[in-house]
Swiss-Prot record:
It comes from the Eukaryota. It holds the Pfam family Mito_carr. The keyword Membrane applies. The keyword rRNA-binding does not apply. This is Mitochondrial glutathione transporter SLC25A40. PROSITE patterns: SOLCAR. Signal peptide: none annotated. The gene is slc25a40. Belongs to the mitochondrial carrier (TC 2.A.29) family. It comes from Xenopus tropicalis (Western clawed frog). It is found in: Mitochondrion inner membrane. The chain crosses the membrane at residues 20-40, 104-124, 143-163, 200-221, 236-256, 299-319. InterPro entries: Mit_carrier, Mitochondrial_sb/sol_carrier, Mt_carrier_dom_sf, Mtm1-like.
C-alpha cells in the first residue's frame, strides 16, 4: 500500500511550478555535462569524414537531438581550428588547450531554447499524469509509469516538432519574421498542416517506447533500491543508479528506431532546407528495410556503445538532479507547513 500512496503524497507536497523548476535545473546540468561528449564525437567524425557543405548532421545536448547544417566544407561554423586528434581523450585535451574550454559547449545555447522547455513539459507532465493515474486506478498502479511516460513524451514531441522544423529552416539562411511566416504558409498550403510535423513519426517511434520503458524500469529499480537500503525517499545515489540502468535498457531496446530516426531526421532536414529539391523523403519502414538490405539485421543496432555512453549518463544526471530538486522542495514545503501550525 505504501508504494501506491507515496506518489499521491508527493504530488500534494510539490506544486507543478516546483516540478518545473526542478526539471529545468536538471536539464541545464545534463546539458552542461553531456554536451562535451557529443561535441568531441562530432569533431572526430568531421576529422575522419569531413562534412559536405549543405549537409546535415545530428547534434545532441543530452536532452534532445538537433539537426545542424554544415554551412561550409571545413565546418568552421562549429570550431576555429580543424585539429588532428588521436582519440577521444586527445580530442578533449587539444580542444581545451588550443581553443579554450568553452569550445566543448559549441552550439549549446541555441539548442537550449527548445530543449529546456521540452524537458520541463515532459517531466512535469509525467509526474502529474502518473499521480492522476494512481489515484484513478490504484489497483493498476504498476502500469501508471508506463502509460504516463509514453503519453508525456508524445505530448512534448508533438509540441516541439514544428519549432524544431522552423529552427532547421532558419539555419540555411536568416529569415525575418515576415519571411518565416510566408515560408510556413507556403509549406502548409502545399502539404497541409501536417507539413509542420515532418519527421514527427520516426521521433515518436523511438522516443515514446523509450520513455515508457525508461520510466517503468526506473520506478521498479528505484523501489527495489529503496527497499534494499530501507529508505522511503530515493537518495541521490539511488536515483543516479536507477536512471543509468533504466536508460541503458531503454536505449538498447529502442536502438533500431534510433538508427532509422537519425537517418530520416537528416534526410527530412535536408529536404526542408533545400525546398527546391524534388526528392521525396522515404518512409520510416522503407528506411528500415533499406538498412537491413545494405548492412544486414545488425545494421539496425549500429552505434550501440556510443548511444549507451551518451544516454546512460544523461538519464542518470537528469533524473538524480530532478529527484534532488523535488526532495528539496518537499522539505521546504513541509517546513512551511510546520511553521504555519
Amino acid at each position: 500500500m505504501q508504494k501506491n500512496t507515496e506518489p499521491v503524497q508527493e504530488a500534494i507536497n510539490i506544486t507543478p511550478s516546483q516540478q518545473m523548476i526542478a526539471s529545468s535545473m536538471g536539464a541545464l546540468l545534463t546539458s552542461f555535462f553531456v554536451t562535451p561528449l557529443d561535441v568531441v564525437k562530432i569533431r572526430l567524425q568531421a576529422q575522419s569524414k569531413p562534412f559536405i557543405k549543405g549537409k546535415c548532421f545530428v547534434y545532441c545536448n543530452g536532452l534532445m537531438d538537433h539537426l545542424c547544417l554544415c554551412t561550409n566544407g571545413n565546418g568552421k561554423a562549429w570550431y576555429r581550428a580543424p585539429g588532428h586528434f588521436r582519440g577521444t581523450t586527445d580530442a578533449f585535451v587539444q580542444i581545451i588547450r588550443n581553443e579554450g574550454i568553452k569550445s566543448l559547449w559549441s552550439g549549446l545555447p541555441p539548442t537550449l531554447v527548445m530543449a529546456v522547455p521540452a524537458t520541463v513539459i515532459y517531466f512535469t507532465c509525467y509526474d502529474q499524469l502518473r499521480d492522476i493515474l494512481i489515484r484513478s486506478m490504484p489497483e493498476r498502479a504498476e502500469i501508471a509509469s508506463l502509460v504516463a511516460g509514453a503519453t508525456a513524451r508524445l505530448w512534448s514531441a508533438t509540441l516541439i516538432s514544428p519549432l524544431e522544423l522552423i529552427r532547421t529552416k532558419m539555419q540555411y539562411r536568416p529569415l525575418s519574421y515576415k519571411e518565416l511566416r510566408q515560408c510556413i504558409q507556403s509549406s502548409v498550403a502545399k502539404d497541409g498542416w501536417l507539413a509542420l510535423w515532418k519527421g514527427w513519426g520516426p521521433t515518436v517511434l523511438r522516443d515514446v517506447p523509450f520513455s515508457a520503458l525508461y520510466w517503468h524500469n526506473y520506478e521498479l529499480v528505484k523501489q527495489s533500491l529503496c527497499q534494499r537500503y530501507n529508505t522511503l525517499q530515493p537518495t541521490f545515489a539511488i536515483s543516479f543508479t536507477a536512471g543509468a540502468v533504466s536508460g541503458s535498457i531503454a536505449a538498447i531496446v529502442t536502438l533500431p528506431f534510433d538508427v532509422v530516426k537519425t537517418r530520416r531526421q537528416v534526410e527530412v532536414g535536408e529536404l526542408e532546407m533545400f525546398t527546391y529539391s524534388q526528392k521525396r523523403s522515404s518512409s520510416t519502414w522503407k528506411l528500415m528495410r533499406a538498412i537491413v538490405i545494405e548492412n544486414g539485421f545488425g545494421g539496425l543496432f549500429a552505434g550501440l556503445i556510443p548511444r549507451l555512453i551518451k544516454v546512460a549518463p544523461a538519464c542518470a544526471i537528469m533524473i538524480s538532479t530532478y529527484e534532488f530538486g523535488k526532495s528539496f522542495f518537499r522539505k521546504l514545503n513541509n517546513e512551511r507547513q510546520l511553521k504555519s501550525l
